[in-house]
């Protein structure tokens, strides 16, 4: 089971990762008759910690990656409408002309130690939000996913840079 834990801003939280299963039946046995379905994007999972103007980004391995994404650091205060929050998202490189997603390898050009400013221009991104773990001093992990998703959609202002990963609630009847 999931144990209660104390959330502290700027201390990354180990993400929940998907388990492999052999069949649809096994999925239903593990998670029940109602579940959310989302697209799997080919990007970098990120945990975004925000408190006022202070913003830090962490990878799924809990590594601080803020320096690779100065554009996110710059734009987040205009997108997030909360005093503080911990959000989960997938960063995906895009083709600026078509809006199409680019392969993960293109995004990894951002991970070079030098010429970050050039990489920001050459490899534009979108931040695709899918969960909220903490908001305005409250632990959101105790809420069910649908409630967290509503809260996320209330505080993240969607635009061409910040989007929600499309989600569908499915039922096994």
Task: For every predicted segment, state its role.
Residues 1-173:
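Catalytic cores of nucleic-acid ligases and guanylyltransferases
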């Amino acid at each position: 089971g999931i144990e209660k834990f104390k959330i502290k801003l700027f201390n990354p939280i180990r993400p929940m990762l998907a388990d492999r299963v052999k069949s649809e039946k096994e999925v239903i046995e593990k998670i029940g008759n109602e579940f959310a379905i989302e697209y799997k994007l080919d990007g970098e999972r990120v945990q975004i910690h925000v408190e006022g103007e202070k913003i830090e980004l962490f990878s799924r391995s809990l590594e601080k990656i803020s320096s690779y994404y100065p554009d996110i650091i710059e734009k987040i205060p205009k997108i997030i409408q909360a005093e503080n929050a911990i959000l989960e998202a997938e960063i995906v490189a895009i083709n600026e002309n078509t809006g199409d997603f680019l392969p993960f390898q293109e995004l990894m050009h951002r991970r070079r130690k030098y010429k970050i400013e050039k990489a920001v221009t050459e490899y534009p991104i979108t931040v695709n939000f899918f969960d909220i773990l903490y908001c305005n001093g409250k632990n959101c992990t105790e809420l069910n996913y649908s409630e967290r998703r509503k809260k996320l959609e209330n505080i993240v202002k969607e635009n061409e840079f910040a989007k929600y990963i499309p989600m569908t609630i499915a039922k096994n009847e």
